[in-house]
């Protein structure tokens, strides 16, 4: 009898654990299908801390990045969060967090903002300071 009770309680515990884990799963769909991160994530070690919110298709994820790098582009490249091509005006960002926005391919681009205001420089030229908040938004 004790053995049956032990097995039953073990099975019930496993079922409850599986149910809790399943409820916390975020599905990769649409633009987020190839995303590296689906949940807010903290990365790096360094003196400065900046937040970078990535927005695409009504979904977003925020990266809290600790870094000693001088520019946002360097900090994002250090963690593999952005990729693109060097052009006449600096880095042309095409991929953020694994999400593609290539104007020549799909008509989308990455808008770059600081505290809700569009930046007049690219990520590779944006000097960073502790406590700043940036947004990279997939726009058409």
Give the role of each language-model region.
Residues 2-12, 17-140:
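Ubiquitin-like/PB1-type beta-grasp interaction modules and other compact soluble beta-rich domains
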């Amino acid at each position: 009898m004790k053995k049956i009770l032990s097995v039953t309680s073990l099975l019930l515990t496993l079922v409850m654990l599986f149910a809790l884990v399943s409820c916390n799963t975020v599905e990769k769909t649409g633009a987020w299908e190839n995303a590296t991160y689906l949940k807010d994530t903290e990365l790096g070690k360094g003196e400065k801390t900046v937040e970078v919110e990535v927005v695409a298709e009504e979904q977003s994820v925020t990266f809290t990045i600790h870094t000693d790098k001088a520019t946002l582009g360097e900090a994002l490249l250090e963690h593999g969060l952005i990729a693109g091509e060097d052009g006449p005006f600096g880095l042309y960002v095409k991929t953020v967090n694994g999400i593609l926005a290539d104007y020549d391919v799909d008509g989308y681009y990455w808008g770059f903002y600081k505290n809700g205001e569009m930046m007049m420089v690219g990520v590779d030229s944006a000097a960073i300071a502790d406590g700043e908040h940036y947004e990279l938004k997939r726009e058409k």
